[in-house]
């Protein structure tokens, strides 16, 4: 990014293509994982996370879905109730969660995480 202006920074993030927005989906790792994999990693479906900020702080659950368009993730157990009583998932920004265990079924992800460590 070239400009320092906050409005242009926000615009660049908003208008970025999806392969660039993937880089904004990183979350900090727990202390147990940090020694092996570094400070942060991209969140994928299946990772176990704990919510660190907001009304649902302390809630632990698996990542059920993620949206690159809005830059949010959906964690099981984090929901709000509508007026009619139905529960709807509450999207959370990845920076507000901490990854406690990684989904390692993907060999490509394992090579990415162990690269340069």
UniProtKB/Swiss-Prot annotation:
Record-level Gene Ontology MF annotations: rRNA binding; structural constituent of ribosome
GO terms under cellular component: large ribosomal subunit
Keywords: Ribonucleoprotein, Ribosomal protein, RNA-binding, rRNA-binding
GO biological process, one term: translation
Pfam families to which the protein is assigned, alphabetical: KOW (PF00467), Ribosomal_L26 (PF16906)
Gene3D superfamilies reported for this sequence: 2.30.30.30
Highest taxon of the lineage: Archaea
NCBIfam families linked: rplX_A_E
Family, per entry: Belongs to the universal ribosomal protein uL24 family.
Function, in words: One of two assembly initiator proteins, it binds directly to the 5'-end of the 23S rRNA, where it nucleates assembly of the 50S subunit.
Description of how the protein assembles with itself and partners: Part of the 50S ribosomal subunit.
Protein name: Large ribosomal subunit protein uL24
Species this protein is from: Methanococcoides burtonii (strain DSM 6242 / NBRC 107633 / OCM 468 / ACE-M)
């Amino acid at each position: 990014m070239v400009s320092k202006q906050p409005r242009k920074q926000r615009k660049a993030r908003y208008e970025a293509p999806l392969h660039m927005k993937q880089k904004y989906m990183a979350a900090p790792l727990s202390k147990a994982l940090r020694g092996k994999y570094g400070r942060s990693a991209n969140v994928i479906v299946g990772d176990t996370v704990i919510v660190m900020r907001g009304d649902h702080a302390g809630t632990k659950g698996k990542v059920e879905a993620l949206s690159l368009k809005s830059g949010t993730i959906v964690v099981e157990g984090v929901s709000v109730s509508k007026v009619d009583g139905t529960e709807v998932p509450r999207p959370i920004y990845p920076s507000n969660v901490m990854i406690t265990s990684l989904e390692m079924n993907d060999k490509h992800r394992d090579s990415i995480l162990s690269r340069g460590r």
